[in-house]
């Protein structure tokens, strides 16, 4: 889909799925758009704007331009791996006023180039291999009375950082993950990633919505149970109703502190016990 001849077809397919639904919020996967939004063909942008104008919000995974400020150097424009929220109301130019989430945890070689390895990225012809990095904590999106905290791809591995978002300001009532894991094919990575998302919901007591291009697209309740999902590698839209939650779970309040204290206590006991037992006498 990163090839120019496939970009337009992919965008048309996604817009068709968006127009076929009547959801308050439609979430498209990571890099559903393989070009920045301002380069969307006018006819497709008008179709999307018409749908949003009817009262529907749309979140799109795409690369976005970000002005990166460099100390002592000239500012530079870089791409970020982002989620853009188009929503009803506001400015006439929805894009100009659209909130955005920029991915913070970047994948080596795929999203940033480790020092000294530019030659490898060039050799492998990896598309968009050097993204800018988003802030650690970013404000959730306000949609329909809910506050939705987005993360991208494997960022949902980091429970402590999702916890930090819930503790910041008004927190979030729903979690959302957008992913493009086509790179892993039909491997165990798909169900494993879903299990990771379920754990984040269980830890935080928040439902999670997952939009992926190959699987697993799913809705997870606040108890970590999958309430609906699409079959992997099928074209379609998952239509679900999700109610956000509030309040703080023990994990959200304390994080990994209890398990760290238990680990330290167990290690201390393991070191002390042999000394206390001492040599046995016949």
Where do the protein language model's features map onto the residues?
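Enzyme catalytic cores with a strong preference for nitrogen-chemistry domains
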Residues: 1-282
């Amino acid at each position: 889909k990163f090839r120019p001849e496939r970009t337009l077809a992919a965008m048309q397919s996604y817009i068709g799925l968006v127009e076929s639904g009547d959801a308050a919020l439609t979430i498209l996967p990571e890099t559903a758009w393989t070009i920045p939004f301002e380069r969307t063909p006018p006819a497709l942008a008008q179709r999307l704007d018409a749908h949003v104008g009817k009262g529907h919000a749309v979140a799109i995974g795409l690369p976005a331009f970000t002005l990166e400020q460099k100390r002592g150097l000239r500012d530079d424009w870089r791409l970020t791996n982002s989620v853009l929220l188009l929503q009803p109301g506001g400015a006439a130019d929805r894009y100009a006023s659209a909130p955005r989430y920029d991915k913070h945890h970047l994948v080596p070689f795929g999203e940033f180039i480790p020092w000294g390895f530019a030659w490898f990225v060039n050799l492998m012809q990896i598309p968009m291999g050097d993204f800018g990095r988003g802030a650690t904590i970013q404000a959730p999106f306000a949609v329909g009375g809910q506050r939705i905290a987005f993360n991208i791809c494997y960022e949902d591995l980091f429970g402590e950082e999702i916890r930090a978002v819930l503790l910041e300001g008004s927190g979030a009532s729903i979690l959302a993950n957008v992913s493009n894991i086509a790179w892993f094919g039909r491997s165990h990575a798909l169900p494993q990633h879903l299990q990771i998302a379920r754990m984040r919901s269980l830890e935080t007591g928040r439902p999670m919505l997952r939009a992926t291009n190959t699987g697993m697209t799913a809705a997870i309740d606040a108890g970590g149970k999958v309430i609906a999902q699409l079959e992997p590698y099928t074209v379609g839209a998952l239509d679900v109703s999700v109610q956000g939650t509030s309040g703080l779970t023990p994990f959200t309040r304390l994080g990994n502190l209890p398990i760290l204290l238990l680990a330290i206590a167990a290690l201390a006991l393991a070191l002390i016990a042999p000394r206390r037992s001492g040599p046995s006498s016949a």
